[in-house]
């Protein structure tokens, strides 16, 4: 995604006649590459991003190395420099829009419930959902200020809710009820998430992953299996399955594998206070595909708005102290782990979806008015324009100090997320996180 970002800067600069001296994948010493014209295309030693170097940037002017030629970056009119600065984020945002748009045009398997209105199939006894008055068969017609919410919207809103009441409008066999629901807080990987113990109507539990050495693997459960009954009772939900597993006794499962129906027996494994069977569930899926470009573009737009909304809520909770920045922000190691996890759960489709999410976040982040980032360049251009109205200009000393502040901030942020990633790896090595245990139930 960083390469796409830098390519945006590069190609727009080339189109506008600005000399590009270096296009680098990575930072630090040059490992290898090639030269075409005035540009050195290189791979560098530290694979944590990349950069584009234009002729006649700030430091060259300060060091007296600028020749003042017409193809230097700072010799360009403000509108050209603005287009070059904004091109990187725009390329990222466009990429983020194109990924889900292309995906739905090609077609992919998606949870069948994501786009459906919330109709409750199971409410866990004793849960906050039951205490609020929700029952099996209820249809949620309003969730906060959202009318006819889908399961996707419901899930996203609940997971970022940290103990606040949510007003609900419920249709129960034609009777309209006004209820309030407060999600319970569950800690996963030492980070809080909102949880509501209810589910859509299920006809089976799909198997997305099977953990090595688990009861599921020992019993012969495989990825793609569909569990239709447990101890002779039809599957009605994941919480029903968990309740039976927590009894700690051998279970008998009816499993659909392709055209076959199998009977599988297994005994849950005890870990701490819990009994685990050792697989990750998958909801029923359907082929999501359209031949309409307009529909596909709308899907791409909605997908990105959803990501922005969730990201905004998480950052708001970080700044308000409700959520830990140390647990919420990931660096290169964390992103690599998320990529592997996305592939394990959804294959290359999951990886591509994650790349779109990262591309969007990278594009939006770079528009923030922080020195060194593209938003900082745009801010400087705005200041230049305002000063120009009264006959003043920015001094090179101010530019240098502005860039130095930004450079320090970016280094501190990079160090922070890399240390976080390393700390999480060490914690997992010595102490298995609750999130993983929850996943295996």
Regions found by a protein language model. Name each.
Residues 68-79, 192-218, 226-228, 233-364, ...:
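Functional transmembrane alpha-helices
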Residues 1-67, 365-386, 390:
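Small-residue-rich helix-interface/hinge motifs
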Residues 2, 92, 96, 100, ...:
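Hydrophobic alpha-helical transmembrane segments in multi-pass membrane proteins
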Residues 86-118, 155-159, 164-171, 175-211, ...:
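PDZ/PDZ-like peptide-tail recognition elements
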Residues 119-142, 154-157, 169-173, 178, ...:
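Low-complexity, proline/glycine-enriched hydrophobic segments characteristic of transmembrane helices
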Residues 83-96, 353-367:
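Pore domain of cation channels
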Residues 103-142, 146-149, 192-229, 233-236:
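PDZ/PDZ-like domain segments forming the peptide/carboxylate-binding groove
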Residues 15, 50-122, 174, 377, ...:
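Internal alpha-helical transmembrane segments
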């Amino acid at each position: 995604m960083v390469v796409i970002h830098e390519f945006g800067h590069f190609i727009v600069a080339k189109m506008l006649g600005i000399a590009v001296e270096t296009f680098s994948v990575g930072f630090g010493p040059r490992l290898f590459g090639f030269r075409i014209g005035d540009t050195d295309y290189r791979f560098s030693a530290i694979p944590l991003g990349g950069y584009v170097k234009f002729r006649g940037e700030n430091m060259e002017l300060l060091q007296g190395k600028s020749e003042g030629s017409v193809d230097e970056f700072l010799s360009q009119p403000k509108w050209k420099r603005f287009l070059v600065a904004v091109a990187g984020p725009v390329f990222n945002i466009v990429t983020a829009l194109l990924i889900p748009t292309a995906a739905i045009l090609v077609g992919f398997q998606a949870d069948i419930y994501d786009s459906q209105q919330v109709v409750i199939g199971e409410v866990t006894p004793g849960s906050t959902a039951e205490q609020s008055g929700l029952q099996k068969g209820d249809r949620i017609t309003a969730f906060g200020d959202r009318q006819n919410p889908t399961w996707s919207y419901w899930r996203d809103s609940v997971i970022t809710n940290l103990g606040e009441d949510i007003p609900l409008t419920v249709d129960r066999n034609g009777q309209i009820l006004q209820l309030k629901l407060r999600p319970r807080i569950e800690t996963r990987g030492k980070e809080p998430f909102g949880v509501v113990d209810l589910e859509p109507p299920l006809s089976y539990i799909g198997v997305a992953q099977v953990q090595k050495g688990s009861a599921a693997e020992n019993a012969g459960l495989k990825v793609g299996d569909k569990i239709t009954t447990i101890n002779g009772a039809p599957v009605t939900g994941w919480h029903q399955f968990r309740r039976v597993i927590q009894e700690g006794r051998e279970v008998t499962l009816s499993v659909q594998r392709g055209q076959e129906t199998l009977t599988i027996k297994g005994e849950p494994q005890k870990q701490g206070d819990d009994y685990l069977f050792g697989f990750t569930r998958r909801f029923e899926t359907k082929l999501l595909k359209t031949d309409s470009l307009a529909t596909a573009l709308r899907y791409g737009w909605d997908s990105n708005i959803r990501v922005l909304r969730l990201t905004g809520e998480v950052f708001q909770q970080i700044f308000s102290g409700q959520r830990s920045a140390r647990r919420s922000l990931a660096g290169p190691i964390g992103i690599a782990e998320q990529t592997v996890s996305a592939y394990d759960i959804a294959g290359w489709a999951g990886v591509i979806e994650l790349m779109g999410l990262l591309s969007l976040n990278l594009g939006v982040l770079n528009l923030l008015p922080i020195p060194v980032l593209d938003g900082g360049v745009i801010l400087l251009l705005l200041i230049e324009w305002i000063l120009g109205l009264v006959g003043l200009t920015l001094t090179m000393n101010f530019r240098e100090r502005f860039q130095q502040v930004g450079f320090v901030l970016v280094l501190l942020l990079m160090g922070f997320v890399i240390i976080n990633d390393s700390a999480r790896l060490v914690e997992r090595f010595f102490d298995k996180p609750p999130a993983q245990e929850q996943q295996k139930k």
